[in-house]
Regions:
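Residue-level recognition of hydrophobic positions within alpha-helical transmembrane segments
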Residues: 28, 33, 186-187, 236, ...
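Short, charged helix-to-loop "capping" segments that act as catalytic/coupling loops
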Residues: 110-115, 126-129, 206-210, 286-294
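Catalytic core of soluble alpha/beta enzymes
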Residues: 126, 134-275
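Flexible C-terminal active-site loop/helix
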Residues: 248, 252-256, 269-342
Length: 342
């Protein structure tokens, strides 16, 4: 797997298109994800279990530490994974029995009326069992304050409430806006400004404490994660299963998060993202962080019908996949319908 990584990521001509960022990097990620899917299927294991049961030295040998050793060295990664072997069997058993916490974005879209938002907030928490919901914010401060007040009243004090600005603010505006949210006991504010602005996020994080900054779904490489962590620029780290170059880079990001003691709450929601990203959160629980505390996976209830093994939710938790592979195999009907035929 390391040979495949080096072949694509460090190709001297492909690097002119990046390096290690953008569509080129995401395309490499698709190829490497397919290779890991094949490896997991040959082993007869879901990807999370394949990764979780690999020997530390073997897994670390697949990772690329170029540009990373000022933050994480290979021997540190091996030590983290060896420490993660303690209690692994019990965590696998717990994961298969209980699942992994999810949270719902369903109530939060800006186009919804207050009545629809409140009804969905109650349904997602009281009926479906989610312990956190997330609302979009950033268009109008008065609308945000009203909607947050109604949402908090609807879900009560024991359900977590997060907000997502989708990069809409500059740094001073973010600080001013978010500091009006302190009464709502927010779990985090997501993507307050440009995902490339490490210093801006660090400035916001200091200014809005104790509200936590969450970001990461748009980060284009492990190198940017390294800088965010070194700058203490967020409280909650997020990943996306398709933004970077496949499982090897995502595993390295989780190891970085462990080194810097940051919880990871993955982004999901697009076609296949729930199916894909849950494997990495579960791998983290089994083999890296060893905990679900402060960790959950985003869930959006659409587009799952396109997959052979769609995501299952039970009592607000992701059911651990047991089918071999990475979970993103599409049905034949969908593949034939949407195949690009040139």
């Amino acid at each position: 797997m390391r040979i495949a990584w080096d072949l694509f990521v460090h190709d001297s001509q492909l690097r002119w298109l990046g390096p290690e960022k953008g569509v080129e990097h995401m395309a490499i990620g698709a190829v490497l994800s397919a290779l890991w899917d094949i490896k997991a299927k040959r082993a007869g294991k879901p990807l999370w279990l394949l990764l979780g049961e690999m020997e530390p030295e073997e897994l670390v040998s697949t990772l690329d530490f170029r540009y990373m050793t000022d933050a994480l060295r290979p021997e540190e990664a091996v030590a983290i994974l060896k420490e993660g072997q303690k209690g692994k069997a019990e965590r696998i058993k717990h994961l298969l029995e209980v699942g992994y916490p999810g949270y719902s974005t369903a109530p939060g879209w800006l186009g919804y009326s207050d009545e629809k938002m409140v009804a969905l907030a109650k349904e997602e928490t009281q009926v479906k069992g989610f312990k956190q919901i997330k609302l979009k914010v950033g268009q109008n401060i008065n609308d945000d304050l009203r909607r947050l007040s109604k949402a908090r009243e609807a879900i009560g004090p024991d359900v977590r409430l997060a907000v997502d600005a989708n990069q809409v603010w500059d740094v001073p505006t973010a600080i001013d806006w978010i500091n009006k949210f302190h009464d709502f006991d927010l779990a985090w504010v997501e993507e307050p400004t440009s995902p490339d602005d490490v210093i801006g996020h660090a400035t916001i994080a200091r200014a809005i404490n104790p509200i936590k900054v969450a970001t990461g779904e748009q980060m284009q490489s492990r190198i940017l994660y390294k800088q965010y962590l070194q700058a203490n620029a967020f409280g909650i780290m997020q990943i996306d299963a398709t933004r970077v170059a496949g499982p090897q880079e995502i595993v390295l990001e989780y190891l970085l998060a462990k080194k810097f003691n940051k919880p990871v709450c993955p982004h999901a929601g697009g076609v296949g993202l729930c199916e894909a990203v849950c494997h990495f959160a579960m791998f983290d629980y089994v083999a890296v962080s060893g905990t679900m505390d402060g960790r959950m996976i985003e869930y959006v209830d659409n587009q799952h019908e396109h997959f052979v093994h769609p995501t299952e939710i039970k009592d607000g938790n992701y059911v651990a996949p047991t089918a071999p592979g990475n979970g993103t195999e599409m049905t034949l009907e969908t593949a034939e319908k949407y195949l690009y035929r040139g």
